[in-house]
Amino acid sequence: GTFTDATKTLKCTPPTELAPEMLILVSDNGKKVWKYAATNSYGNGGHGGAGADFNGPGVVGGNWWGVETPDGLADQLGHVPGGTATGDEAAGAYMVFTEDGVVTSYKPTGEAIRSGKFEVKNYDPERSSGWELGKLVTSEPALLFPWMINGGGKGVTEFDIMYFTPQAMTLVYTNGQASGGWGEITHWCFIGGSPDPLTMEGTWTYDANGYGKGGHGGAGADFNG
């Protein structure tokens, strides 16, 4: 008989370790969903120049106005080119950042709206500049509702990162306003979560009356609220 010794050489490339700022955006899963914050997800304010005032999720220094809930974005189509709804004005819209540097915005149905490349520049978690933590730059206006307030439909591609954790992100567009000059700026507040949008519908909490006992009456219709 014959004996065949078959060998095959495999080239294994270890995954590149992600930078800290990329881990925040895409997680160690390599992709991550971001949605509108529950309040103040889009609005405007004055450029007060103090980045430290952006000290929590949805907290905007110099805030003048913001949508009370994401549903309010449907009333802000005057800032969109042509005033046309594209789907990201819906409360359930979301965007996905991936480790290969692509961000895609989606309608609540999962249909893609727009996509582009992204990168984080000059990330400085110490905020040495006194203002931003870094810049989030996209190749085109690809984020959720990326329109400058009172900008005549101007799409934003360079954002100042003001608050940045795995759970929440606040972005600002200054439109060249002088720091501390109180000129109008636009802000966006997002929350981050699972790599799967279907798992981000809400947070599980206990109901105040959520634990107890009772008799098995057999009427499922009695569980009506």
Map each language-model feature to its residues.
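Short, solvent-exposed loop/turn elements at domain surfaces
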Residues: 41-48, 211-217
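Surface-exposed interaction/gating patches
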Residues: 31-37, 41-45
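A recurrent domain-boundary module in secreted/ectodomain proteins
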Residues: 176-194
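Short, exposed coil/turn segments at beta-strand boundaries within extracellular/luminal domains
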Residues: 1-16, 180-183
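Acidic, glycine-anchored loop motifs typical of Ca2+
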Residues: 51, 56-58
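Short, exposed beta-strand-loop hairpins at the edges of beta-sheets
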Residues: 160-161, 168-182
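N-terminal helix-cap/turn-to-beta initiation motif at the start of protein domains
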Residues: 12-35, 192-205
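Contiguous, well-ordered beta-strand patches that form the walls/edges
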Residues: 69-166, 209-217, 222-225
